[in-house]
Amino acid sequence: MGAQLLAYAAGGDIEMLLEELSRQPLAEIGWDNIFPHSLENNCKLRTLLDLPFPVLHWHGDRIILPNTAELIASSCRCKEQLFSIGPLAYGLQFHVEIDEEMVNTWIKEDQKFISSVLGADGQFILKQQQKEFGSKTLASRLEFISTLFDLLS
């Protein structure tokens, strides 16, 4: 929600995420990679994204970036995953802060959304993904957060 508010406050907008060809509603929920949007982007965060960078996605919207935003990273389903507006404002449409307890809480509280996106086995799928990626990606996610804080200081 913070990335959406940041973009909206700067003149952007938010709309439902749609599948490109069918224009049917699409949601991103679960672990998947983000990747650099442009090779020319010199943002320090970009270097962390050169390798596969799995993060947790949990949204059904996309951000229409304002003209002042610079797109840094995308995913296969949603172009607007990481962006900056000026040197001190960054928007993330994914979750690097997540731990197993948080995922389990979200799974418990968001069952309807999970089922609508992933089907009846959605809760099981998310728990399995968390076991697969949670601890394995912790170091890279902490490095991402540390680099982001360095950029903001």
Task: List the model feature ranges, each with a label.
Residues P36-S153:
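Amide-donor transfer/coupling interface in amidating biosynthetic enzymes
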Residues M1-S38:
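Cysteine-nucleophile active-site neighborhood
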